[in-house]
């Protein structure tokens, strides 16, 4: 997998996957410096950008840490106590769509995080919905964010 990173424009691992790729031990607690070092190690594998999901520095918060060259950023958002299956795939898909439309790293991170959070918020109060998130109601917002056009 590490060899494939040399050919990637962007890699989008969660924290566990990022540690495995970088050959670093996984830790339950970490600092901003730890994540900065992890992003640097991922960039040394060769991708143009590295984006790590599931990074939280404060209780009740999670977010996205990303780096490309000398640009580094962190985009925080609310963390919910429930587990929502498929959110990594939702995030990666939304990020890729924004990135391929020419959005910057910062904008792609933001658009994908906001969309994923909207999908979670559409789902979190439905105890019968156990098999993923309700992504369809937020698609119009995603399209508008990526294209800058009202999809209606």
Question: What are these model-derived regions, one by one?
Answer:
Residues 106-152:
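Charged C-terminal helix
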Residues 72-85:
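Short pre-catalytic strand/loop immediately N-terminal to key active-site residues, enriched for Gly-Thr
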Residues 1-72:
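Conserved phosphate/ATP/ADP-binding segment of small-molecule kinases
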Residues 20, 82-105:
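Short, small-residue alpha-helix embedded
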Residues 27-34, 100-110:
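Short, charged, surface-exposed loops that flank catalytic or proteolytic processing sites
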Residues 17, 54-58, 78-81, 112-117:
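Glycine-rich beta-alpha junction loops
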């Amino acid at each position: 997998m590490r060899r494939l990173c040399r050919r990637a424009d962007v890699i989008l691992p969660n924290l566990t996957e990022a540690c495995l790729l970088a050959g670093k031990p996984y830790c339950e607690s970490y600092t901003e410096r730890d994540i900065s070092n992890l992003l640097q190690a991922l960039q040394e594998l060769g991708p143009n950008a590295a984006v790590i999901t599931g990074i939280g520095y404060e209780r009740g918060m999670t977010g996205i840490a990303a780096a490309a060259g000398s640009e580094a950023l962190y985009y925080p958002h609310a963390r919910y106590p429930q587990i929502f299956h498929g959110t990594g795939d939702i995030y990666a898909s939304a990020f890729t769509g924004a990135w391929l439309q020419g959005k910057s790293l910062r904008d792609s991170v933001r658009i994908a995080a906001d969309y994923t959070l909207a999908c979670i918020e559409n789902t979190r109060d439905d105890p019968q919905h156990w098999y993923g998130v309700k992504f369809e109601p937020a698609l119009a917002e995603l399209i508008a964010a990526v294209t800058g056009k009202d999809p209606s």
